[in-house]
């Protein structure tokens, strides 16, 4: 299926970032950690070329890599991934909108899992604030 998408798209098409991230998650679920890492890195390469519009996708990929490294027994690489993700979440380049809130909420639990409780709280509060300002109930 990836070959079909490759034939129908230009190299570097932003959709490959999401496709490669999803392929990485599939390989990760199958226990194929090296293949998963390769696809996360392919996704990262595409998204890096699309900065700054892809910053949140890059942050999520760093968080995904941290989870992968835990499963693969590569704990020494986890903190570096999470620190890069935090840097992006705190960046002034990222609009504080609904998509930001969604990604904050999506990643907050993972930060908590790794003991980054202040970051978990920071991301959760940021998401709640955005949802409240939009008239939504936080935590949904």
Regions found by a protein language model. Give the residues of each.
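TPR/TPR-like (Sel1-like) alpha-helical repeat modules
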Residues: 83-87, 112-135
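Amphipathic alpha-helical segments of tetratricopeptide repeats
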Residues: 2-7, 44-49, 86-91, 128-129
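Conserved alpha-helical positions within TPR/SEL1-like repeat arrays
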Residues: 14-29, 56-71, 98-109
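Asparagine/serine/threonine-enriched low-complexity, disordered tracts
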Residues: 4, 21-22, 42, 63-64, ...
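Short coil/turn linkers that connect adjacent helices within long alpha-helical scaffolds
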Residues: 7-11, 49-53, 91-95, 133-136
């Amino acid at each position: 299926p990836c070959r079909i998408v490759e034939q129908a798209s230009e190299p570097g098409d932003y959709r490959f970032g999401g496709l490669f991230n999803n392929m990485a998650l599939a390989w990760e679920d199958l226990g194929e950690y090296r293949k998963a890492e390769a696809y996360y890195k392919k996704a990262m390469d595409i998204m890096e070329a699309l900065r700054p519009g892809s910053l949140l996708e890059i942050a999520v990929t760093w968080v995904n890599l941290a989870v992968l490294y835990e499963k693969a027994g590569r704990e020494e690489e986890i903190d570096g991934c999470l620190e890069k993700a935090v840097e992006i979440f705190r960046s002034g380049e990222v609009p504080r909108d609904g998509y930001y809130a969604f990604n904050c909420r999506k990643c907050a639990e993972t930060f908590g899992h790794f003991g980054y409780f202040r970051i978990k709280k920071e991301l959760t509060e940021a998401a709640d604030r955005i949802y409240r300002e939009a008239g939504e109930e936080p935590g949904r």
